[in-house]
């Protein structure tokens, strides 16, 4: 109540403005608001107009860009392609025209003269080789060379390897010589396998395996087998060759010869009754044990006999 009395008291009511002044103030306020709104709307209209002009300019720029690109395409792609097509068509028409002229020329002269066949013709009247003399490539078909991509890639690899070989060794060689050298290297890298039942004994190994003559050996081999083992690879027949194929061939030859001689000795022993043959056992374990132990005994006897043979040869040379 105290607050209301302060604002609405008789003294305060006298200080209030009159009605005319209030209406004037309201009118001025409305004018100010209208001016502010007009300014805002004017700015919005200006911005909208500028945006419209910008978008129109952008559309025109894009259209112009498309026109320029189309012009460049027509100048660089379409016109040259069309010109080539026209040249091809014109050349084809010219070829057809020349063919037609030649055919008319042939018909005219055949109508004037008699029938032409074989080698009987008059070159003054009609020459069937007229076009070949005029154009040496007339009637010939040119086939482009076949290019295999795998073959080309292999040639490139060979050339690279040859260049590396020349750079490392400093020797110049042709591609054929380089391939021959590569083949020789591959053959040299191959391991020297023996394709016979017994391994070949070198000159140094019999010394290690050699035993004195009076020593006793516990082996179950017959005398015929010992003779075969002694005759296998005699030192005076073995030749050290650098060719792998030659050594393999010699080993096969010696092994086949030894097998034939062993069969002959066995047949002779059976005929004379000297060979002691035990009947084959039906037990699986005994047969497997005999098969496993047999090549070991034969190898030991082979090394021993070869060592004795080498010692005898050395004594004979002395």
From Swiss-Prot:
InterPro entries in the record: FAM228 (IPR040046)
Chain residue ranges for the region called Disordered: 259-297
Family of the protein in this entry: Belongs to the FAM228 family.
Protein name: Protein FAM228A
Protein source organism: Bos taurus
């Amino acid at each position: 109540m105290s607050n209301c009395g302060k604002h609405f008291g008789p003294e305060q009511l006298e200080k209030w403005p009159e009605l005319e002044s209030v209406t004037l103030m309201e009118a001025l306020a409305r004018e100010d608001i209208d001016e502010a709104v007009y300014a805002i709307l004017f700015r919005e209209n200006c911005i909208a107009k500028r945006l419209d002009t910008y978008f129109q300019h952008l559309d025109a720029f894009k259209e112009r860009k498309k026109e320029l690109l189309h012009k460049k395409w027509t100048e660089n792609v379409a016109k040259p392609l069309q010109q080539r097509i026209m040249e091809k068509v014109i050349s084809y028409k010219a070829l057809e025209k020349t063919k037609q002229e030649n055919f008319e020329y042939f018909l005219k002269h055949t109508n004037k003269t008699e029938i032409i066949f074989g080698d009987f013709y008059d070159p003054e009247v009609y020459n069937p080789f007229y076009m070949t003399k005029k154009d040496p490539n007339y009637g010939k078909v040119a086939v482009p060379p076949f290019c295999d991509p795998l073959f080309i890639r292999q040639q490139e690899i060979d050339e690279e390897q040859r260049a590396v070989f020349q750079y490392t060794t400093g020797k110049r060689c042709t591609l054929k010589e380089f391939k021959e050298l590569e083949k020789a290297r591959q053959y040299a890298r191959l391991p020297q396998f023996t394709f016979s039942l017994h391994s070949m004994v070198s000159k140094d190994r019999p010394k290690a395996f050699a035993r004195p003559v009076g020593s006793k050996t516990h082996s179950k081999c017959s005398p015929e087998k010992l003779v075969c083992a002694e005759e296998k690879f005699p030192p005076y027949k073995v030749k050290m060759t650098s060719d792998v194929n030659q050594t393999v061939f010699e080993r096969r030859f010696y092994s086949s010869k030894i097998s034939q001689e062993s069969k002959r000795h066995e047949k002779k022993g059976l005929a004379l009754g000297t060979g002691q043959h035990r009947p084959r056992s039906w037990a699986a374990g005994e047969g497997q044990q005999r098969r496993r132990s047999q090549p070991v005994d034969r190898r030991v006897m082979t090394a021993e006999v070869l060592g004795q043979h080498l010692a005898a040869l050395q004594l004979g040379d002395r």
